Amino acid sequence: SLKNHIGQIFKDYDQVLCIMALGIVVRMIAPYIEHKSKDPAVVVMDEVGHHVISLLSGHLGGANEWTQSISLAIDADPVITTATDVNGLPAPDVLARHEHLLVDDFQTLINVNSAIVGGERVDYYIDASLPNAERLEQAAKAHIGEHGMVHVVSLEELASIPCKNESTEDGSSRVVITDKVIAEYGHQLILRPRTYTMGIGCRRDTPKELILDAIQQSLAVHKLSPKSLVTAASVIVKQDEVGLLEAMQIMGWPIVFYTQDEMAPLIEEEELKESNFVKGTIGVGNVCETTALLAAKSRTLIQHKTIYPKTTVAIAQVTSK
């Protein structure tokens, strides 16, 4: 029966359409609901197509938009109950979905959405240092319309603008788009664009603690949020490196591995400095810079090869879209 498979369906699919009674669906999916950042969009439709109901993950999962699309296609009544939507207000998590931004903290998302529904004007502030700041500005303006203003500012400017928090009502709720670590407030929703990759090289049997320390030091130098990483990267011979894999699991990061044949042309093209020892050991003499650039599909390094105990780290800027 479907009940025996719904758990696997939740893991395998981003969108689930159930054509049956709403109550059946609620009971069936209840044990598998985790968090709005993980759950698939669930839409329910009656068997004759009169009503299409957005049940789960309306914003981040896109269930509300999917409900509208299905309803339009079959001439059904869409049923959407999220407060921002029924009041015709722009929810920041919808922009996050469209622009592939990560919600930094879900409690502040709740706080800011509540402020929007309560009639408060919520402005958007975009970090001027982002490579795609101009495009994000246009997307944010199109999203919020007349319900707020969009500002492209330096983080120094942002720090001087009051923000509402738990201890004071001074300032306003706001949405900030940045890949940098900044001060946190209860009514400041931070949306994280994916802007960089990190190439990592390490000696055989390097413990995860040394790799994690190298990662954290590199992030701290550039004030980068770990949530803005696209992927980590290394050479294929490190795909079974226990310390590296454990470090990735702790960081919650994906990692990709490149072969020496994939790396060698870029090393030559960009004239990347090679270590004779590393080249003699694995066939290429530059791991961290090369793999960071390959993963980023760019030629721009934010951090050149930096040597830490038994570990090397480089950071590349992702080509803006």
PLM region descriptions:
Residues 69-78, 108-118, 254-267, 287-296:
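Short, surface-exposed, charge-dense and proline/glycine-enriched linear segments
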Residues 171-184, 188-191, 288-321:
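C-terminal edge-of-domain segments
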Residues 1, 5-15, 19-22, 26-105, ...:
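Conserved mixed alpha/beta catalytic, RNA-binding, or beta-rich assembly cores of soluble enzyme
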Residues 217, 227-289, 296-301, 307-311:
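C-terminal non-catalytic interaction/assembly regions of soluble proteins
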